[in-house]
């Protein structure tokens, strides 16, 4: 039996391979740490207050803007305070993005990929009012209009991107009690999310219509200030990220072709673990495919959803592989028959599939709708926010439970191997040294698997927290550095690359040696014969199994059988 490359590769060659892969891992960390900026940046834009033009309130082709030729005149707070109705139904809050810097006009780049807007609302009540605390879940109706223009367009050439009338709920607290009015600061609310940043300039017009019969926007006094935080992916980070993807993609494709060719050379059908390795490589290749390069030429508002789907497929395949990988090395099995997904792993994998489908449905409910209406958010209603938060907490808890279960499976594998090592002293020294080396290599690989799983779960939880950070308004100190992101991404590729190489079938054949010859060898030749001794178990039931890929598995199953 030839076994795998992990079992037959010499110690020197294995050391060179591991050292090379570790060097690649360091390079991935350094790419993020030295060459990439922070993954995301943001700008805080204070809304300019402009007087609406009578008769144009319902004209979605009309926009007010605060900079450039034909800009509206900003109103002062004193002008609004002196008006008896606080200029109700006459105000338009204008946000023009991006802001200039040092008198230089900045523009968005397609490398920045996406744009998220969250709104900070400050409201005011007359101090003469008996109201001291606004009611919780204060409903706010907003007429939102988002427009765009490009670098070569005129200052007046704004085009409608999206229009919607949205409801948001405010949770406010008093921040300043004055003689004339009391100011209240409200929690930030999600406003919009663009899956593609295809244009150079964006303009946001917000109106707060008041209607007595409909009881619209009558629960609070008047708007005091609006602050928009626009969050975007940094273009420099995107460039480093795509360079990493572009470099890794052909290597993974090449190693998959090499692996599958070696499997099909053998006179047997592929084993379950070999199928899982090939599928895992396919999921990683789909994730590595630098589709984001298409957004530089084509507007793809579905790119965020597509990225989530690709990452979800990879997570599902990776989590499933780890369960099968550990399970295939739990070497005391109820039946010596060939392992299949349906026979051994359907309970474990069904939980992974259900969890991934749940997250996919949750993602479709938000980002699927946002492709048509970027102002939609599941976080807007109190019930929706609780459901979304529950999904995130449940996903994090599930990931932690999965990691603990995987640790338990690996511990059982180690325990099984430890129990089987009691049979090693009865073997010849050459055979014992060979199997001790296999056990050491296997344990090292399993510990690397646990490390990879731990970092993956940590990255998943931190990613979910970062996504919800601006939405549930918690002061969570998170530092998702570029080095961590590129390092973990590189780790996935290097880990899977190593598994495909090490678990590829080895074509090295062990020359036959009669057992009687072993007893006549001198002590000086025993260790040297380890490289040429056939590992042969004539009474082992699994020897007749054409899908067996590991002589370590054969060894432990034989001891269990005996």
Swiss-Prot record:
Record-level GO BP terms: compound eye morphogenesis; cuticle pattern formation; Golgi to plasma membrane protein transport; imaginal disc-derived leg morphogenesis; imaginal disc-derived wing margin morphogenesis; intracellular protein transport; positive regulation of protein secretion; positive regulation of Wnt protein secretion
Name this protein carries in UniProt: Protein wntless
Superkingdom, taxonomy of origin: Eukaryota
An MF annotation (GO) of this entry: Wnt-protein binding
Membrane topology: Multi-pass membrane protein
InterPro entries the UniProt entry points to: WLS-like_TM (IPR047843), WLS_GOLD (IPR053936), Wntless (IPR009551)
PANTHER family named in the record: INTEGRAL MEMBRANE PROTEIN GPR177, PROTEIN WNTLESS HOMOLOG
Spans within the Cytoplasmic topological domain: 1-15, 261-275, 333-344, 412-441, 504-562
Record's GO cellular component terms: cell projection; early endosome; endoplasmic reticulum membrane; endosome membrane; extracellular exosome; Golgi membrane; multivesicular body; neuromuscular junction
Its biological purpose: A segment polarity gene required for wingless (wg)-dependent patterning processes, acting in both wg-sending cells and wg-target cells. In non-neuronal cells wls directs wg secretion. The wls traffic loop encompasses the Golgi, the cell surface, an endocytic compartment and a retrograde route leading back to the Golgi, and involves clathrin-mediated endocytosis and the retromer complex (a conserved protein complex consisting of Vps35 and Vps26). In neuronal cells (the larval motorneuron NMJ), the wg signal moves across the synapse via the release of wls-containing exosome-like vesicles.
Primary location recorded for the protein, binned into one broad class: membrane
Membrane spanning stretches: 16-36, 240-260, 276-296, 312-332, 345-365, 391-411, 442-462, 483-503
Gene source species: Drosophila grimshawi
Quaternary state and interactors: Interacts with wg; in the Golgi. Interacts with Vps35, a component of the retromer complex; wls stability is regulated by Vps35.
Lumenal side: 37-239, 297-311, 366-390, 463-482
Family the entry assigns: Belongs to the wntless family.
Entry keywords, A to Z: Cell membrane, Cell projection, Developmental protein, Endoplasmic reticulum, Endosome, Glycoprotein, Golgi apparatus, Membrane, Postsynaptic cell membrane, Segmentation polarity protein, Synapse, Transmembrane, Transmembrane helix, Wnt signaling pathway
Stored Pfam families: WLS-like_TM, WLS_GOLD
Glycan-modified residues: 58, 103
Compartments where found: Presynaptic cell membrane; Postsynaptic cell membrane; Cell membrane; Endoplasmic reticulum membrane
